Amino acid sequence: MNVIDLSDPAINVDYDSLIGIDNEESQEIFENEVKEDGQQEEQEEASSRKDGLIVEPGRDVESLRRAIRDQLLFKIHRQNQSDCADARKLSNDEEDESRQQKLERIREELEELKIENLTSEMQTEIKELCEIQSKLATESSSRLTNLRKKLLETYEGQDTVILPNIILDTSNIKRLQKLDQKISLMERFVGIPEALEAEEDRKSVHSKVNELYRSIQLLQGDDKAEGKLQKFRDRLVELNEEFENSLLGKKIQQDLRLKDDTVSKLVMPENKVKEINSMYSMFKQYQDSLPLLAERMKSLNKMNNRVIEVYETTKGLDSQITSIQEQGKVWLKALNELDKKFDEQEVKIRENMEQIRRKIDTLEDEALQRNSK
């Protein structure tokens, strides 16, 4: 029995030229005389061996046609499988095929070959390949299990964990603690940061100290020259002298009532200075609570604005409700008028209906009289 070697690359079959083999027009019938001797078969075998083909003797056209059709269907099936495999590879981001996947793929291909109608020798070869594949699969699975066991044994064997050598220096921590205490003391004298953040201007402590220094300098005066308050006092004295020398001052000197009134209403510079000092001391007492009062006033102002907005909206709604009520009254009046007109129309229609009935009765009587005559 001759064997067809399917893995030989020298055999190139043109399947496109064999597509029309099922057509009745392309079929040709060849007649051949059967010889008793086997010379013809030997000549055919020799010619086929020269061409590189091994042909089975005694094979009819139907079996050849079936074999070609099966080969074509197998090729199409393999092409579809390769397309599906390519699509899977692309969907898996072109990952490399592992050894277990290769063995699985070989097993599937061998199962497909088992299904086909092949010769006994090819079936034996396929069985041998299946055995080799199963052996390789068992070897790979055993290797994986051994590796897992080794990894688990090495992992379970590690009972102790080596930590890095960390040296803690307590001197830096103590320094930080001292600095924190100093900062807390400074905050007590300077002010709380939360109160500073609550203010809108958020001025620094240095700028606030400069402002206080300027205000104190205005009140106490400068050591190098005359104080500013002294200059202010001298200017007030000059203005007082000018006022006395003016016409109004002369009138006041002449009229005692006018003088008493002006003196009672006049505020002396000493009183002004005392009032400024008292205000300064009062401001110094309430300087911590002034930002909170300012924030409270702002919140009350916002609340007042919201109340005004609500009042305006309610006022607008009230005006709209009144306009709707007026429109309702107008519509009610119009409906009453329509009701009256409908009643009048109904009365008129009834009167007209009675007149029509009377006319119909008279016409019926006249018709009966005419018929009787």
Swiss-Prot record:
Cystine pairings recorded for this chain: none
Organism (species): Saccharomyces cerevisiae (strain ATCC 204508 / S288c)
Quaternary structure (record): Component of the dynactin complex composed of at least ARP1, JNM1, NIP100 and ARP10. Dynactin comprises a short rod of ARP1 polymers attached to ARP10 at its pointed-end and probably associated with the capping protein at its barbed-end. The rod structure is implicated in dynein cargo binding. A sidearm formed by NIP100 projects from the ARP1 filament and is implicated in motor binding. Interacts with ARP1.
GO cellular component, one term: cytoplasm
Coiled coil spans: 114-139, 200-245, 331-367
Region Disordered: start-end pairs: 33-53
Residues recorded with modification Phosphoserine: S91
Alphabetically ordered keywords of this record: Coiled coil, Cytoplasm, Cytoskeleton, Dynein, Microtubule, Phosphoprotein
Molecular function per GO: structural constituent of cytoskeleton
Localization of this protein: Cytoplasm, Cytoskeleton
The protein, known as: Nuclear migration protein JNM1
InterPro entries the record matches: Dynamitin
Keyword Signal among record annotations: no
Pfam families: Dynamitin
Predominant subcellular localization, coarse grouping: cytoplasm
Chain's role: Component of the dynactin complex which assists cytoplasmic dynein by increasing its processivity and by regulation of its cargo binding. The dynactin complex is required for the spindle translocation late in anaphase and is involved in a cell wall synthesis checkpoint. JNM1 is associated with the rod and links it to the projecting sidearm. Required for proper nuclear migration during the mitotic cell cycle and for astral microtubule development.
Membrane listed as a keyword: no
GO BP annotations listed: actin filament-based movement; establishment of mitotic spindle orientation; mitotic spindle organization; nuclear migration
Domain of life: Eukaryota
Lineage: Eukaryota, Fungi, Dikarya, Ascomycota, Saccharomycotina
Name of encoding gene: JNM1
